[in-house]
């Protein structure tokens, strides 16, 4: 996705009430990471990344600890990560990442959002060749030379690096998430966000009117409590 599109989404997230929208999604990401790889952040890079993302949003430590404990609790819900493929107008392709303890509820909600907002849900795996899963790290912009950082991180699985005025973006194969995170930590770089994302192999460009039309669907998807992330091929 293009950086302009990312800015647009970030602006929307900034308007969200953190207590009602952002924190529950971050807590669910922490619980899922802890269930998948264990509750010790030192041994679980995905959990470390989820905690770092929560801290970047000023999520209280008590909330973070509670989310980790939920993964270990005997009565904890069985939260599953599920992906749905869909399409919108103007050639827009969409992958929706959900974390849910009730897949029947979630798929019904996602289907309804697509159908009511000019989109269509597709058979599972329909977009698997249209996107590539990548490890994506957003870092505080460092004072060190970017080329030197790039050379250091290549040995840890770096495939690409980008920078803007406020941040440094580091990309790698999804299988290299742990090793790339290790390299970033060894260089004492500050992680703002870290995740596995689906990035489009080809993008589509929308004008302002088309973007507003598609965003109605994207906004509804992102507002759903079970939706953790929405990936598109918008430039």
UniProtKB/Swiss-Prot annotation:
GO terms for molecular function: DNA binding. GO terms for biological process: regulation of DNA-templated transcription. The keyword Ribosomal protein does not apply. SUPFAM superfamilies: YebC-like (SSF75625). It comes from the Bacteria. Gene3D superfamilies: 1.10.10.200, 3.30.70.980. This is Probable transcriptional regulatory protein Ccon26_04940. The keyword Lipid metabolism does not apply. It is found in: Cytoplasm. NCBIfam families: PRK12378.1 (NF009044), YebC/PmpR family DNA-binding transcriptional regulator (TIGR01033). Keywords: Cytoplasm, DNA-binding, Transcription, Transcription regulation. Its main location: cytoplasm. Belongs to the TACO1 family. It holds the Pfam family TACO1_YebC_N. GO terms for cellular component: cytosol.
């Amino acid at each position: 996705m293009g950086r302009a599109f990312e800015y647009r989404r970030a602006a929307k997230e900034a308007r969200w009430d953190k207590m009602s929208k952002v924190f529950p999604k971050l807590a669910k990401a922490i619980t899922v990471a802890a269930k998948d790889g264990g509750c010790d952040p030192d041994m679980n890079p995905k959990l470390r990344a989820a905690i770092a993302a929560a801290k970047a949003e000023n999520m209280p430590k008590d909330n973070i600890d509670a989310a980790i404990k939920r993964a270990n609790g005997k009565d904890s819900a069985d939260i599953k990560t599920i992906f749905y493929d869909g399409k919108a107008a103007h050639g827009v392709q969409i992958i929706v990442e959900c974390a849910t303890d009730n897949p029947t509820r979630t798929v019904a909600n996602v289907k309804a959002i697509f159908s009511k907002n000019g989109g269509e849900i597709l058979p599972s795996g329909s977009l698997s060749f249209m996107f590539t899963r990548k490890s994506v790290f957003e870092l505080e912009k460092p004072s060190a030379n970017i080329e030197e950082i790039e050379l250091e991180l290549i040995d840890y699985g770096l495939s690409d690096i980008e920078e803007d005025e406020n941040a440094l973006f580091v990309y790698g194969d999804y299988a290299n998430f742990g090793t790339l995170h290790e390299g970033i930590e060894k260089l004492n770089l500050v992680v703002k966000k870290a995740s596995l994302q689906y990035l489009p192999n080809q993008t589509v460009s929308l004008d302002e009117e088309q973007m507003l039309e598609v965003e109605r669907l994207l906004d509804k998807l992102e507002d759903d409590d079970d939706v953790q992330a929405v990936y598109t091929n918008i430039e």
